[in-house]
Amino acid sequence: MCGIIGYIGNDKAPKILLNGLRRLEYRGYDSCGIGVVDNNKLIIKKNVGKVEEVAKKERFLDIDGNIGIGHCLHPDTYVILPDGRMKKISEIDEDEVLSVNFEDLKLYNKKIKKFKHKAPKILYKIKTAFSELITTGEHKLFVVENGKIVEKCVKDLNGSELIGVVRKLNYSFNDNVEFKDVYVERHYKLDETIRNKLRKVREKLGLTRKDVEKLCGVKEIYIVKIETGKLESIEEERLKKLCSLYGINFEEIIYRDNLHYTNPVKFPKTPTPELMQIIGYIIGDGHFPSNRMLRLKDERKEVLEEYNQLFKTVFNLEGNIKKGDGNYYILEINSKYLIDWFRENIPELFNKTGNERTPEFVFRLNNDLVASYLRGIFDAEGYIRAEAKQIGIGMTSKCFIKEIQFLLLRFGILASYSKIKRKEENWNNTHKLLISDKKSFELFKKYIGFTAKDKMEKLEAILNKMKGLNFRYISIPLTKKEIREFVGVPLKTIKNGDNYCTDYTIEKIIEELNSKGLYDKAEYLKRFLDADIVWTKFKIEEVESDVEYVYDLEVEDYHNFIGNLIINHNSRWATHGNVCKENAHPHTDCKEEIAVVHNGIISNYKELKDELMKKGHKFKSETDTEVVPHLIEEELKKFKEINEENYIKAVKNAIKKLKGTYALVIINKNFPNLLIGARNESPLILGINDDGYFLGSDITAFLDYTNKAIPLEDGDVVVIKKKENGYEVTIENNGNTVEREMMEINWDISSAEKMGYPHFMLKEIMEQPEVLKVSAKISAEEIKELAKCIKDYDRVYFVAMGTSLHAAMVVEYLFAKLGKLVIACDASEFLNKGVVDDKTLVIGITQSGETYDTLKALRFAKKNKAKTGAIVNVLGSTATREADITVMMGAGIEIAVCATKTYTSQLMILYRLFIEYGKLLGRDMSEYEKEIDKIPNYIKEVLDKKETIKEIANNLKVNNYIFISKGINIASALEGALKFKEITYLHAEGMSGGLLKHGTISLIDENMDTVAIVPPRDSAVFNSILSNIEEVKARGGKVIAITPTEIDGAENILVPEVIEEISPIVYAPAFQLLAYYKAVELGRDVDKPRGLAKSVTVE
């Protein structure tokens, strides 16, 4: 449920509960219900539907009664994501991680949910040879105990168990990485023939050198030097200007006269093995003394000679190698353009010592490219110790070392981690990785290796002497004794013992079992040997918490994830049930004496439910909430006498067993004078008036009755007792009675519903990051089905009106990129110009699902045997019933007439439709898919500029505005103008920048402001819109630029630099806020503009 309310007092509970549910309905409901104690009977009324619909159907107000209700790990833990990146659990915003299937011991991508909890005072540190993990005592790990893989709480570990760690990462990668070019000013070498040609053409045209300067800007003195040979070369731009003035074809002079430029540096478009090796070495031991020089150093001259050749291959640049002051050589590469290119594409190369990081794109690359990157790092900082039989690397950046450790796992190379504390003052600690087992040595040699010949010779020599001995990890978590018992026959390879086998021994056992014909036994052991995980010993200690919050994940299916290489158990994947009467709140116990409403998620509900079912409890729903009344019922059984005091204790004991986020309100028919509430990370507010007390998930629930409230805090349990002469209210936290400050709310109902924002429109604009997270996932199968229809049908129309039509215009551009013609059509004109038959697909976009013209277009299409689809926000609307395929947007209720969050939600759905269509064509759409999860953060960046936008809006003084853009953002210009005029009541017109010269530019002066929506810098129309801006400025027009880059002479609203395909989504909040703040400044009715309705249901 989206909101809950409880009441105890002298008034009729059903009336107050119904009113509270009505007030909370703006949050969105799919079902609702109430529970009331009347004459010691618990009466539950609930069903699927809107509040009024359910209240009427279930006859809420027929009930009497005066009491009722209406509906971890340390944050620095690194988790492995499916694309190979590692990310702190506290920073994860992805929806999948890698999880272990203990059936085949392999890793798979699984969906997750993340939870944050208050950290206890004491945590536990688990230390293995490979990593450390800091966690709460209640957190579970997968361990081996007595030869079996079991789940065990950290606080119960004794150190004799084995913990699972990752040995190899297998996942799909996407190396579709493209680098940006940087400007390189070319200088062309001129011979005497070209000099004379330029001079003769000038003279033939009758131009003096002074004339040339005036006409094209090339200085007279420069022309003298070129023609007389005092300058041996000429810059490309100046040569182009002269050619243009002289009427000479620039390309022709370059190729026919065989001109060569003197600085022929080249830049790669995509990663190559040679480039990745260079990048690895620079991060390891590179240095930029200036903005035009790079230095590498090494003890071995031949290594630098090899890297000099790599620079020649990749960049067409050669450096100089010289002897350094010590026992090393230096390779210097001098090129400003090379440094510019590195700074533009790989800024991580410029991190200071101690802050080294792997460029993020590296994690997306294929293994060949990653191997080259690692080779460069190990060339720079790696070493071999022949005596210790170890390959090692040490750096002062812990994060970078961890990244190397993760990347090595791609190849099955397991490296142990250690931290060396430096005794010297002001010296950073060193973080080291050591590779010491034979299997990892072999894989390192095969995939990575060293450039230095002597290092490779040492590696070979060590390998020749090594056996398959591994003392830091165990591949098969069975002792020798347990292995002999498992195979059931005598083995020559091993004798009974309580120790574990090395890989070398396991290989010998497998050979022996195969020779005996015990192939199934051999295959079972080989499965462990080839697994993605191994097992290791550990140490454990208690430590004081140094953080306020700890984190946990819910992982579907396998219920585990990788944290700091260690396999962690999770809070079970919560199934909260479908929309049905059984799953509606309130929920009751077996005897139907206790009723509970709940907001949030009980993350350990599955374990609790399993335990309760074993004890005979019968569940009626699929929800997590239902465990609460059953748990209270079970706790009550522990008391010989059931009285008020013991009931309260039972409730508190039950609450202690809950994990997750919750706001609970609880009643019991046997104790009609008690109302109990509990809060943990989900809002719950206590309302107070003379006739009773309220509990609500927000103030709106009871603001009609009182403005006095106490916001409860995490861990609070409130007990409200109704007595003959008044009420007794107790708030406890961790068993201690606490006082909470009462506040008087000055909001009216409208302000409360707006969550304190002055208008619904602003609230809905600010909700967009969260809304888009829903729109990014909803209706996945329906979108795939609609994409297939687009592929199968000859003609495709998107019909819509107003804001929805602008969204449809965006989709025209998206599908054009994939070679598919789709038509965005004004639904009111579709009957006049639509060409419709049984080979036609017509998709209606309508927020309400009730837009008259859009429904009329869909009905016209069906009448002519076309296939129909609808992209809709309101479930159960007319459009959902009439279309063949319905795609829900998931934007939630939008109250303001002016569409904001529903527009960006529509764009997200259409962007996903574009991606699915591309996949059907066999295109690689992975880069586009990755942008989906980034969009909410991009939107947040724009929303963070709201004060800047407000200031700009308040400085707009004219009554006429033009919104311009080009390409896909023409739709943004049209939508921006629509937003502006519909709530400011000022004239605003949106158009393509290309139309300015076709009449509109004559209107530009100091009384006409222009809002320019500037596309991303890599857009083909970026320079064109800049030209439009200059045209406006030249005529005295003021320019407001919504832009990813500063525009001189304009008032800039800076937005993130994104790919062009998602820019209409990212830019939208900027012009929405601009319109909003200007309308507020003018005193307009922002939420209900004059003459407009939320849904146009008439012609």
UniProtKB/Swiss-Prot annotation:
PROSITE patterns hit by this protein: GATASE_TYPE_2, HTH_CROC1, INTEIN_C_TER, INTEIN_ENDONUCLEASE, INTEIN_N_TER, SIS
Pfam families to which the protein is assigned, alphabetical: GATase_7, HTH_3, Intein_splicing, LAGLIDADG_3, SIS
Repeat as UniProt keyword: yes
Residue ranges occupied by any HTH cro/C1-type domain in the UniProt entry: 198-253
Domain of life according to the entry: Archaea
Transcription listed as a keyword: no
Reactions mediated catalytically: D-fructose 6-phosphate + L-glutamine = D-glucosamine 6-phosphate + L-glutamate
Segments forming domain DOD-type homing endonuclease: 278-413
Subcellular location as annotated: Cytoplasm
PTM entry text: This protein undergoes a protein self splicing that involves a post-translational excision of the intervening region (intein) followed by peptide ligation.
Domain SIS positions: 786-923, 948-1089
Entry EC number(s): 2.6.1.16
Main location: cytoplasm
Keyword field: Aminotransferase, Autocatalytic cleavage, Cytoplasm, DNA-binding, Glutamine amidotransferase, Protein splicing, Repeat, Transferase
The Glutamine amidotransferase type-2 domain, residue ranges: 2-71, 571-723
Gene Ontology biological-process annotations: fructose 6-phosphate metabolic process; intein-mediated protein splicing; protein N-linked glycosylation; UDP-N-acetylglucosamine metabolic process
Active site annotation, chain numbering: C2 (nucleophile), K1094 (for fru-6p isomerization activity)
InterPro entries linked: Cro/C1-type_HTH (IPR001387), GATase_2_dom (IPR017932), GFAT (IPR005855), GFAT_N (IPR047084), GlmS/AgaS_SIS (IPR035466), GlmS/FrlB_SIS (IPR035490), Hint_dom_C (IPR003586), Hint_dom_N (IPR003587)
A cellular component term, taken from the record's GO annotations: cytoplasm
A GO molecular-function annotation: endonuclease activity
Subunit architecture: Homodimer.
Family, as annotated: In the C-terminal section; belongs to the SIS family. GFAT subfamily.
Functional note: Catalyzes the first step in hexosamine metabolism, converting fructose-6P into glucosamine-6P using glutamine as a nitrogen source.
NCBIfam families linked: glmS (TIGR01135), intein_Cterm (TIGR01443), intein_Nterm (TIGR01445), PRK00331.1 (NF001484)
Protein name: Glutamine--fructose-6-phosphate aminotransferase [isomerizing]
UniProt organism field: Methanocaldococcus jannaschii (strain ATCC 43067 / DSM 2661 / JAL-1 / JCM 10045 / NBRC 100440)
Lineage: Archaea, Methanobacteriati, Methanobacteriota, Methanomada group, Methanococci
